[in-house]
């Protein structure tokens, strides 16, 4: 297979070849073993920034001739694959920032490398994922929609068994958060590899984000963490890329090890999320949520700095707005009791 030979030689693919690569992965007449070899070969090579844009566009265009758009919409997500076994930080963050009247369209999946992905947590909460068609109406009603990648992109469902066969993260850990079905204005995305920071930031800009931050969490997490300096690449549609670091002390939070953020099963993570949103949990788990929510509020232009965003995120939890947002979603309901 010519394409596989090119991948084995670590040669970059152009847009046409990337389209062919995606077509091979979804073809019914090709075995999972061959697909796994293709995916492994692609994931072993160092992807270029252009290739990342190409594959993202290939995936989007395989499903949508024109992406749907909802004004000022945002997604907060990580690539996964960091093997930290943390609780569902970005899903918890989504409730907080949606309570600030930011239309949140979170594009998630079942976990591949941990015990609970965002879709697993939603099932435990009794919250249904939305369809692309129903999302605008849901945003108008409750300001937050969760989309399952395996529903919005059939390729994600078809390659799920292949990804399960593989021991290491694949390119789809990276592209999954990038290819939100909606053409977003804002995005915060976490990665577990520093080599991907600038490439992903530029790709998000290529895909039309007005403002976005890509963050590498201290000590290898795919969220901003409390254990040290977090590396950030920030892109704006009309400005040059900025890169800098931010640590908990910079935004008024205490240091804590990444081990303090460990979660568990979907039901255990539900309890963690509930305790944060109701104000019961005042531990490092709450702090990491307000840290990441603060970054998101800054990206969505609700505040002028990450530190102000952290203060606002704390207020949204402490005044009961965050748990009220959760209760709007139609799952189990709780009161603020902090």
Curated annotation (Swiss-Prot):
Q: Binding positions for Mg(2+) 1?
A: 90, 223
- Cellular component per GO, a single term: cytosol
Q: Which UniProt keywords apply?
A: Amino-acid biosynthesis, Aromatic amino acid biosynthesis, Glycosyltransferase, Magnesium, Metal-binding, Transferase, Tryptophan biosynthesis
Q: Which reaction does it catalyse?
A: N-(5-phospho-beta-D-ribosyl)anthranilate + diphosphate = 5-phospho-alpha-D-ribose 1-diphosphate + anthranilate
* UniProt: 5-phospho-alpha-D-ribose 1-diphosphate binding residues: 78, 81-82, 86, 88-91, 106-114, 118
Residues that hold Mg(2+) 2 according to the record? 222-223
What are the names of the required cofactors?
A: Mg(2+)
**From its record, what is one biological process in GO terms?**
L-tryptophan biosynthetic process
Summarize subunit and interaction data from the UniProt record for this chain. Answer: Homodimer.
Name under which the protein is recorded: Anthranilate phosphoribosyltransferase
Lineage at the top is: Bacteria, Bacillati, Bacillota, Bacilli, Bacillales
């Amino acid at each position: 297979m010519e394409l596989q030979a090119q991948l084995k030689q670590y040669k970059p693919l152009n847009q046409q070849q990337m389209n062919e690569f995606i077509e091979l992965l979804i073809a019914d007449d090709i075995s999972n073993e061959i697909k796994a070899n293709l995916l492994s070969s692609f994931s072993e090579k160092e992807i270029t920034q252009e290739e990342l844009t190409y594959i993202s566009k290939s995936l989007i265009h395989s499903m949508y001739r024109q992406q749907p758009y909802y004004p000022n919409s945002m997604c907060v997500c990580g690539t996964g694959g960091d093997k930290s076994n943390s609780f569902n930080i970005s899903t918890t963050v989504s409730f907080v920032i949606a309570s600030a009247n930011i239309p949140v369209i979170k594009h998630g999946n079942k976990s591949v490398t941990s015990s609970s992905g965002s879709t697993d947590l939603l099932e435990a909460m009794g919250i249904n994922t939305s369809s692309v068609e129903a999302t605008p109406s849901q945003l108008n009603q409750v300001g937050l929609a969760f989309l399952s990648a395996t529903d919005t992109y059939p390729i994600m469902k078809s390659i799920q068994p292949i990804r399960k066969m593989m021991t290491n993260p694949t390119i789809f850990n990276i592209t999954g958060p990038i290819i939100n079905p909606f053409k977003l204005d804002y995005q915060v995305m976490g990665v577990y590899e520093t080599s991907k920071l600038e490439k992903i930031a530029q790709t998000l800009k290529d895909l039309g984000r007005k403002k976005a931050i890509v963050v590498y969490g201290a000590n290898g997490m795919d969220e901003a963490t409390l254990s040290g300096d977090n590396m950030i690449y920030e892109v704006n549609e009309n400005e040059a890329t900025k890169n800098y670091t931010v640590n908990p002390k910079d935004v008024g939070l205490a240091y804590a090890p990444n081990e303090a953020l460990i979660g568990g099963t979907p039901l255990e993570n539900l309890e963690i999320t509930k305790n944060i949103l109701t104000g019961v949990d005042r531990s490092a788990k709450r702090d990491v949520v307000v840290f990441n929510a603060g970054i998101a509020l800054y990206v969505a232009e609700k505040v002028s700095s990450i530190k102000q965003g952290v203060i606002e995120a704390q207020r949204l939890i402490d005044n009961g707005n965050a748990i009220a947002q959760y209760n709007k979603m139609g799952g189990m309901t709780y009161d603020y009791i902090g």
